Amino acid sequence: MYDISGWKHVFKLDPNKELSEEHLEMICESGTDAVIVGGSDGVTIDNVLHMLVSIRRYAVPCVLEVSDVEAITPGFDFYYIPSVLNSRKVEWVTGVHHEALKEFGDIMDWDEIFMEGYCVLNPEAKVAQLTDAKCDVTEDDVIAYARLADKLLRLPIFYLEYSGTYGDVELVKNVKAQLKQAKLYYGGGISNAEQAKEMAQHADTVVVGNIIYDDIKAALKTVKAVKGE
């Protein structure tokens, strides 16, 4: 079993986006600590299975970030369950989770499941619109969400999601200073190695996503930038 607490760099692949077999191989053989499969829309059991089968040809750990209960399938190493703490809709905080547990609770392997406390900070992002996230928040608000995840809910992961735009480095630094046991994941807008390295100075885990589809070479350079190898 892998230890997620040591992961510094992960790639996130959207099953609803096209990725060539050649580029997938580059991603999986890049030295990244893991590959997360997940997206905000168009996620189906068919495209999730396609990604799973493709990634399983390689040794890299593989995680399904669950956004649709209908697209869950066995075979992943871990399952990340996001709870959008700044959503205005209770369904994205605990609602869909309750429904899933009602249906699948008896057969779930709890050693494979990790809850993520999300704070979505880009109002233009699909995930913000889907979850009706309250993005016009102050630094004090974000720190309060971090404390909620870390100290009250005791979640293993607090995820700052800027999705599509590069985030506030000082805010990331200040949030990290508040966390005692939760690991800080940062995702959003990383388009080059320099940005990845900058965020890695503060976040425990840097998530690289969209740049994979825009500039595969730039995406691959983020691995060494984050891990310093």
Swiss-Prot record:
Q: Name one Pfam family in it.
A: PcrB
Q: Which organism is it from?
A: Bacillus cereus (strain ATCC 10987 / NRS 248)
Supply the name of the protein.
Heptaprenylglyceryl phosphate synthase
Residues holding sn-glycerol 1-phosphate: 12, 159-164, 189, 209-210
Which reactions are catalysed by this chain? sn-glycerol 1-phosphate + all-trans-heptaprenyl diphosphate = 3-heptaprenyl-sn-glycero-1-phosphate + diphosphate
Q: Which domain of life is it from?
A: Bacteria
GO terms for MF: heptaprenylglyceryl phosphate synthase activity; magnesium ion binding
State the taxonomy lineage: Bacteria, Bacillati, Bacillota, Bacilli, Bacillales
Which CDD domains does the UniProt entry name for this protein? Answer: PcrB_like
* Alphabetized UniProt keyword annotations: Lipid biosynthesis, Lipid metabolism, Magnesium, Metal-binding, Phospholipid biosynthesis, Phospholipid metabolism, Transferase
Q: Which GO terms describe its biological process?
A: glycerophospholipid biosynthetic process
Task: Identify the InterPro entries for this entry.
Answer: GGGP/HepGP_synthase_I (IPR039074), GGGP/HepGP_synthase_sf (IPR038597), GGGP_HepGP_synthase (IPR008205)
Binding residue positions for Mg(2+): 14, 40
Concerning NCBIfam families, the annotation shows: GGGP-family (TIGR01768), PRK04169.1-1 (NF003197), PRK04169.1-3 (NF003199)
